[in-house]
Amino acid sequence: MPKKVVGKVKLQLPAGKATPAPPVGPALGQYGVNIMEFCKAYNAATAGQEGMIIPVEITIYEDRSFTFVTKTPPASDLLKKAAGVEKGSGEPNKVKVGKVKRSKIREIAELKMKDLNANDIEAAMRMIEGTARSMGIEIIEG
């Protein structure tokens, strides 16, 4: 018989730098999970992606064991890195903060494809372009 799920927790944590401090401690502590065990497992799983924020979905079972699935970094983080900007524009329609080539948009879409609900790469690219526009990042050909 499969284990009974008592909770699912979604967090966005820096790769390789999860600690028992908030937000990890309070989120997992209420389910009685061994927080250090999760931190060690998460840090080992994300060791190669230093400097990125990695979303993680943790499934907690009745016997206080857990499993987790890491996702790809948020599109906004990947776009900020590609454009070389610290943050998006406060007024995206008026003030542009950076430029990204369409080829880079395609790379990001290919990376995010498994997490997006898009059927093909073109649809995924349009989603990423929409995110870029809402951040005030201009898309240039190339």
Curated annotation (Swiss-Prot):
CDD domains according to UniProt: Ribosomal_L11
PROSITE patterns found in the cross-reference section: RIBOSOMAL_L11
Disulfide bonds: none
Protein name: Large ribosomal subunit protein uL11
Cellular component aspect of the GO annotation: cytosolic large ribosomal subunit
Keywords: Methylation, Ribonucleoprotein, Ribosomal protein, RNA-binding, rRNA-binding
NCBIfam families, per the entry: L11_bact
Family the entry assigns: Belongs to the universal ribosomal protein uL11 family.
PANTHER family: 60S RIBOSOMAL PROTEIN L12, LARGE RIBOSOMAL SUBUNIT PROTEIN UL11M
Processing and modification events after translation: One or more lysine residues are methylated.
One GO term of the biological process aspect: translation
Species of the source: Dictyoglomus turgidum (strain DSM 6724 / Z-1310)
Assembly and interaction partners: Part of the ribosomal stalk of the 50S ribosomal subunit. Interacts with L10 and the large rRNA to form the base of the stalk. L10 forms an elongated spine to which L12 dimers bind in a sequential fashion forming a multimeric L10(L12)X complex.
Cited Pfam families: Ribosomal_L11, Ribosomal_L11_N
GO MF term set: large ribosomal subunit rRNA binding; structural constituent of ribosome
Function: Forms part of the ribosomal stalk which helps the ribosome interact with GTP-bound translation factors.
